[in-house]
Amino acid sequence: MSEKIYEYKDENNWFIGKMTGHNLISGWGVKHTTIKKIDDLLDGIAATLDWENPKGYDVSVVRHQSPLSLITFIIDMINQETQREIKVTPHAGTILLMENAKLLAVYLPEGGVSTATFFATSEQGFGDIILIATRNEGKTKEFRNLFGQLGYRVENLNDYPELPEVAETGTTFEENARLKAETISRLTGKMVLADDSGLKVDALGGLPGVWSARFSGPDATDAKNNAKLLHELAMVFDQKKRSAQFHTTLVVAAPNKDSLVVEADWPGYIATQPKGENGFGYDPVFIVGETGHHAAELEADQKNQLSHRGQAVRKLMEVFPAWQAKQS
């Protein structure tokens, strides 16, 4: 048994743990009933561990928003210490623990979920499918990386070529995201996630904003948009006055449900010239916070930890199971 200390921290959750010879969850802000349910869930997992070298988890909770994040943290500890490959899979408002195509345990929210919702799976098996309302493979790749870590399968509009384009006629990020998610969900009968993301530059009064994708005109490309942005800021020499934020609004829509909305910002500055080969959109000209690094210099996993989209998806994952269960 290692002496390694594990830690996970974001704005909603903070866990510190280590492996011991017993199971213990303690701390602030966690209901006793939640702790008992998680302990009962994981006791079944612990029962399959090596009894000659017993391993248990000792986790202190500083802050906590949902069972999903806490269960994922503990399972990650168990996997690293025992070389197991247990997966945490959100499904129809529940949380499934699976390994090698076997279902090990199920966490149910308070009040349970309807059997019709739980067993309404596709021929591909358990696990929620998210249809991303975009044909942009770069954006889809980011979402696939993020959702894949949480057990979701991702499709995009390229899988549904018959669907019409949804005009983004809104004047806010939320209006546009709602238009896409709710329209496509109504047409397909599927759960749909749409994002409206953009770059807000303070010196330009928040532009390009909702017009980020077409900032340089009807035939806009990433290169043209970046060139126009740098031209607009050509006479702004002080980096502090070139402050900007990438913004994402995510909307999840499903038939007969109220839509779920989350938002996040990624602060930084606009560079004087592009740099980096990764990412897409305005990444080459966006300096990340005070780091001096351009977003296009980050590897995908680094960007997912920091970016507006990564932050928004993590917020979404925190509230998503309760949203599913409440409206199922």
From Swiss-Prot:
Pfam family membership, one: Ham1p_like
An example Gene Ontology CC term for this record: cytosol
The protein's required cofactors: Mg(2+)
Keyword Hydrolase: yes
Keywords: Hydrolase, Magnesium, Metal-binding, Nucleotide metabolism, Nucleotide-binding
Record flagged with keyword Metal-binding: yes
Catalytic center residues: 196
InterPro entries: dITP/XTP_pyrophosphatase, ITPase-like_fam, RdgB/HAM1
Reaction catalysed by this enzyme: XTP + H2O = XMP + diphosphate + H(+); dITP + H2O = dIMP + diphosphate + H(+); ITP + H2O = IMP + diphosphate + H(+)
Comment on bound cofactor: Binds 1 Mg(2+) ion per subunit.
Residues the record lists as binding substrate: 134-139, 197, 280-283, 303, 308-309
Entry superkingdom: Bacteria
One GO molecular-function entry: nucleotide binding
BP GO annotations: nucleotide metabolic process; purine nucleoside triphosphate catabolic process
Enzyme class: hydrolase
The enzyme's E.C. designation: 3.6.1.66
Region described as Unknown: spans on this chain: 1-129
NTP pyrophosphatase as annotated region, ranges: 130-324
NCBIfam families according to UniProt: PRK02491.1, PRK14822.1, RdgB/HAM1 family non-canonical purine NTP pyrophosphatase
Its job: Pyrophosphatase that catalyzes the hydrolysis of nucleoside triphosphates to their monophosphate derivatives, with a high preference for the non-canonical purine nucleotides XTP (xanthosine triphosphate), dITP (deoxyinosine triphosphate) and ITP. Seems to function as a house-cleaning enzyme that removes non-canonical purine nucleotides from the nucleotide pool, thus preventing their incorporation into DNA/RNA and avoiding chromosomal lesions.
Subunit structure and binding partners: Homodimer.
Family, per entry: Belongs to the HAM1 NTPase family.
Name assigned to this protein: dITP/XTP pyrophosphatase
Annotated organism of origin: Streptococcus pyogenes serotype M1
